[in-house]
A protein has these predicted regions:
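Active-site SXXK
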Residues: 33, 104, 159, 231-232, ...
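Active-site beta-strand/loop architecture of penicillin-binding DD-peptidases
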Residues: 69-84, 90, 222-257, 268-269, ...
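Primarily short, surface-exposed interaction patches in extracytoplasmic proteins
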Residues: 17, 238, 244, 252, ...
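Short active-site loop at a secondary-structure junction
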Residues: 187-194, 217-222, 245-265, 278-284, ...
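Glycine-rich, acidic and aromatic/proline-enriched surface loops and short helix-turn segments
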Residues: 1-9, 73-74, 226-241, 271-275, ...
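A penicillin-recognizing enzyme superfamily signal
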Residues: 94, 98-101, 105-107, 135, ...
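Conserved catalytic neighborhood of penicillin-recognizing serine enzymes
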Residues: 58-64, 230, 275-336, 380, ...
Length: 436
């Protein structure tokens, strides 16, 4: 009844601004329904006495997707300009999968934290008892709310634990304990907690698996991207550990050396040019002159070992540097560069053999999309963050043409139940005959 009363004058009868007027109009509709036998008088009177039951539309802000939405914003701004982006009421559709996004960000942060922790504890942010300006020091850290870290101060140090209290002004202060097992990584060679942690120390904490854990803000950073290899849709993207501190997107903006992640491109180019899985490549010392006055270039395998004549397949399986360089030397760098350009990894790179080991820089999103043809049967994809843009009238002004191949990513089994193969840990294929 309330909705039926609104079309005549939506602003005048706005129930949020003018509840009494809106209620009067609603009751008028209810009365008309009763007068025309669409509603009993008893029900009509009961409804008239009821209060306006309003539910505001909930606007969801997905903090986990800050990097993703910022990249979309930058893209739309580059295409349509600042004015159209912010004043024309554009509706932008993306292929973002919030579940994938949440897990991707979680995985990225865990990887960065684990790497940083392996390099040891660098000490507290500051000490409240020793530094009068401790609040200034603490205010330098701006945390993304999805981290769910608390700021804490040590109130006592014991042999097997430390007691703390949170000091975050925006949250209710709580007291708790960090057990010895969650402090071990901070101690290193120092066995006593008292040698590392002191009363008044301030640091970050987080509750994990019902136990409080000490947190260290990492000095390293990274990015992660999840692509649909069949359509190119970007399902998840996180450009860094903490968006509040740095909006720099390490997926699309940072150029890094891919290293061994580039080797499959070298091997793919070789397969396109006559190499086979059983082609024998020499895994032995390799020396290349870099010119007058420069040291010779001597690449090495991981572990600094040589394995002699080895099949092409083994080279990619074990990521052998020397075999990869020899393949590049035999094949020729122009062929590798040609495939790199086709896959949009590089535009131009110097023709140096070190490029075959991933010495040239590229972005994570370009490298990831280059792997898609290995999955989808050889189809090149373009990473897609925007699938459609509509103006304020609902007219589509942009439509992504890379339609998803329906069913291409589904596993098809026409034999009913999946076969149950007993794991006997025995090798059933001979390498000498299986790849002829």
């Amino acid at each position: 009844a309330l909705l039926a009363a609104l079309p005549k004058a939506p602003s005048k009868y706005n129930p949020y601004k003018y509840p009494e007027v809106a209620k009067f109009r609603r009751n008028l509709v209810l009365q008309n329904l009763a007068d025309n036998n669409f509603l009993s008088k008893k029900k009509s009177n009961n409804f008239k006495e009821s209060k306006l039951d309003l539910k505001k539309r909930r606007i969801e802000i997905v903090n986990e997707a800050n990097s993703y939405t910022e990249e979309v914003r930058r893209t739309v701004k580059d295409i349509y300009g600042f004015e159209k982006l912010y004043s024309q009421g554009l509706s932008i559709s993306t292929p973002l999968n919030i579940d994938y996004q949440t897990q991707a960000l979680k995985s990225l942060r865990k990887g960065i934290e684990d790497y940083d922790r392996r390099r040891g504890w660098r000490g507290p942010i500051t000490n409240k008892l020793k530094n009068k300006n401790w609040e200034t020091k603490v205010s330098q850290y701006k945390l993304d709310p999805t981290l769910k870290w608390n700021l804490a101060e040590i109130i006592s140090v014991e042999d097997k634990k430390i007691k703390f209290k949170t000091i975050d002004k925006k949250q209710k202060n709580i007291e708790g304990v960090i057990p010895f097992k969650n402090l071990k990584w901070t101690l290193r060679q120092k066995k006593l907690i008292q040698n590392v942690h002191q009363k008044g120390d301030i640091f970050f904490i987080k509750k994990e698996k019902n136990l409080w854990n000490i947190k260290q803000y990492p000095k390293v950073n990274g990015g992660i991207v999840v692509l649909d290899p069949f359509s190119g849709n970007v399902l998840a993207l996180a450009g860094g550990f903490n968006f509040k501190t740095s909006e720099f997107n390490r997926v699309t903006q940072a150029k890094r050396q891919p290293g061994s992640a580039f080797k499959p491109i070298v091997y793919a180019a070789a397969l396109e040019n006559g190499f086979a899985p059983n082609t024998i490549i020499l895994d032995a010392p390799f020396v290349e002159s870099q010119g007058v006055g420069l040291k010779n270039w001597k690449p090495e395998n991981y572990g600094k070992k040589f394995y002699g004549p080895t099949t092409f397949r083994k080279g990619i399986e074990y990521s052998r540097n020397l075999m990869t360089v020899r393949i590049a030397k035999i094949l020729g760098l122009p062929e590798i560069l040609k495939l790199s350009k086709e896959l949009n990894i590089y535009d131009e790179i110097p023709e140096l053999l070190s490029m075959s080991l991933g010495a040239a820089e590229t972005t994570l999103i370009n490298l990831t999309s280059a792997y898609a043809p290995f999955v989808n049967g050889g189809k090149k994809i373009t990473p897609t963050l925007i699938t459609r843009i509509q103006d304020r009238r609902g007219k589509t002004i942009f439509q992504e043409k890379n339609r998803k191949c329906k069913g291409c990513d589904k596993f098809v089994n026409n034999r009913g139940e999946l076969p149950k193969i007993e794991n006997t840990n025995k090798k059933v294929l001979s390498e000498e005959t299986a790849y002829q």
